[in-house]
């Protein structure tokens, strides 16, 4: 189970730069015009063989240059509640501010370890400013420069040393893990209640630390499954969940620990930015997807035409991944709830699809010969052999070609679409790799 590292701090201390440094990305919030928040605050990192997730909670705050103290407080409370390790970023060039003091007051009550990161220590002289931060009462300030990378390797060592030991979970690998995710008020709690009913349906619960996901095993409607449950569904939130960054961070653990994500959309509101943010997390983690249009009972025009238009809109907003089941349901009336579980199980089975090598080549090579990759500067690309990789999280295929470097993304999407036409891969991402033959 991945550990979660949260970066907190007041504006302009270098949180985004540190996030990019830790996740080895250039998806900077820095120097970027405001737009969609997808993919900007969440990333994966690995150090000393330990994989963990990094979240910059401040990335969801609008107009962070003029942030209100209340928003900072909510951001820090979120980190205290959710994170395994908290990075409190301060600025050695500006010294201790009133806002730093307020953040530190909250963090001193945190159960998770807090590492105070003294950023912008771009030269040795600036290190002499760091002792000022002892007054915050959070131990030693750790000097780094997020821009140059100075000190970040040692910081990663320290982060990993703070992680709890891996919890051993006794889970049956043959039983699917479903997570219900979605923005606030989309009906997550209602559909969970519709799934599980009374507590007597619980078979067993397995939990690690208080911040770990709880895997609750159920047998409903003849289905055996684990429901991945985090604090976000049943626990009363300490922070107002209307905050966009809050609902997205809440979804991280559920998504990471699930096989299939049931994404709830509100039929009365359509697709909103938070839905796309959560979808992005699902795709980044390569999880199966079932989309549920909840509150369909509140829509007056329930004609087949309206359903088709609604479905087309969703697929266009979720593109390029469009091969997933969409179910129009009502958690309140339990309309099509059984269908949701059926589709989730089907997607789980599709994730484990194994296609024999002989069939892959029989079906795909004639198609490739008829529609070959576009030539590049007079060089013709030939794909000669296809095989499926073993032991992968999702179906993954290798196409062996003479000039793999010239096979572009549009042609890979063409191959993926043709594979989805020939085999049932609905709801699951697939990977296509082009390699030298």
Swiss-Prot record:
Domain EngA-type G: 3-167, 176-352
Family assignment from sequence similarity: Belongs to the TRAFAC class TrmE-Era-EngA-EngB-Septin-like GTPase superfamily. EngA (Der) GTPase family.
Lineage: superkingdom: Bacteria
GO molecular function, one term: GTP binding
Residue intervals passing through the bilayer: none
Alphabetized UniProt keyword annotations: GTP-binding, Nucleotide-binding, Repeat, Ribosome biogenesis
Record GO biological process: ribosome biogenesis
Family matches, as PROSITE patterns: G_ENGA
Annotated positions binding GTP 2: 182-189, 229-233, 294-297
Protein name: GTPase Der
Function (record text): GTPase that plays an essential role in the late steps of ribosome biogenesis.
InterPro entries assigned: G_ENGA (IPR031166), GTP-bd (IPR006073), GTPase_Der (IPR016484), KH_dom-like (IPR032859), KH_dom-like_a/b (IPR015946), P-loop_NTPase (IPR027417), Small_GTP-bd (IPR005225)
Binding site for GTP 1: 9-16, 56-60, 119-122
NCBIfam families attached to this UniProt entry: GTPase_EngA, small_GTP
Keyword hit for Transcription regulation: no
Residue ranges of domain KH-like in the record: 353-437
């Amino acid at each position: 189970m991945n550990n979660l590292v949260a970066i907190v701090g007041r504006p302009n201390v270098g949180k985004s730069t540190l996030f990019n440094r830790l996740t080895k990305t250039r998806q900077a919030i820095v120097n970027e015009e405001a737009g969609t928040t997808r993919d900007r605050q969440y990333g994966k990192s690995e150090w000393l063989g330990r994989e963990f997730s990094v979240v910059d909670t401040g990335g969801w705050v609008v107009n962070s240059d003029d942030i209100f103290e209340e928003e900072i407080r909510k951001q820090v409370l979120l980190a205290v509640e959710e994170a395994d390790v908290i990075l409190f970023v301060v600025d050695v060039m500006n010294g201790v501010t009133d806002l730093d003091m307020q953040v530190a007051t909250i963090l001193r009550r945190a159960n998770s370890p807090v590492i105070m990161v003294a950023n912008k220590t771009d030269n040795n002289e600036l290190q002499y400013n760091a002792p000022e931060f002892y007054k915050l009462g959070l131990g030693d300030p750790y000097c780094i420069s997020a821009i140059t990378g100075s000190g970040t390797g040692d910081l990663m060592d320290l982060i990993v040393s703070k992680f709890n030991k891996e919890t051993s979970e006794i889970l049956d690998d043959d039983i699917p893990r479903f997570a219900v995710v979605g923005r606030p008020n989309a009906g997550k709690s209602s559909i969970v209640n519709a799934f599980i009913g009374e507590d007597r349906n619980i078979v067993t619960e397995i939990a690690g630390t208080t911040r770990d996901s709880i895997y609750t095993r159920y047998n409903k409607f003849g289905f055996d499954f684990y429901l991945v449950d985090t604090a976000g569904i049943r626990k009363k939130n300490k922070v107002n969940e209307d905050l966009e960054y809050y609902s997205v961070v809440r979804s991280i653990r559920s998504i990471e620990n699930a096989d299939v994500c049931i994404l709830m959309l509100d039929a009365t509101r359509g697709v909103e930015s938070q839905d796309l943010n959560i979808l992005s997390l699902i795709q980044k983690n390569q999880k199966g997807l079932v989309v549920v249009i909840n509150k369909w009972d509140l829509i007056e025009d329930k004609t087949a035409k309206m359903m088709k238009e609604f479905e087309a809109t969703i697929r266009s907003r979720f593109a390029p991944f469009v091969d997933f089941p969409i179910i129009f349901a009502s958690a309140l009336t339990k309309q099509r709830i059984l269908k949701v579980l059926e589709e989730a199980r089907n997607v789980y089975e599709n994730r484990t699809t194994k296609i024999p090598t002989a069939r892959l080549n029989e079906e795909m090579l004639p198609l490739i010969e008829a529609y070959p990759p576009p030539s590049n500067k007079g060089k013709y690309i030939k794909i000669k052999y296809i095989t499926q990789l073993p032991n992968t999280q999702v179906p993954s295929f290798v196409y062996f070609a003479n000039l793999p470097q010239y096979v572009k993304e549009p042609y890979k999407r063409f191959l993926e679409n043709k594979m989805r036409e020939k085999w049932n891969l609905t709801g699951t991402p697939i990977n296509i790799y082009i390699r030298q033959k």
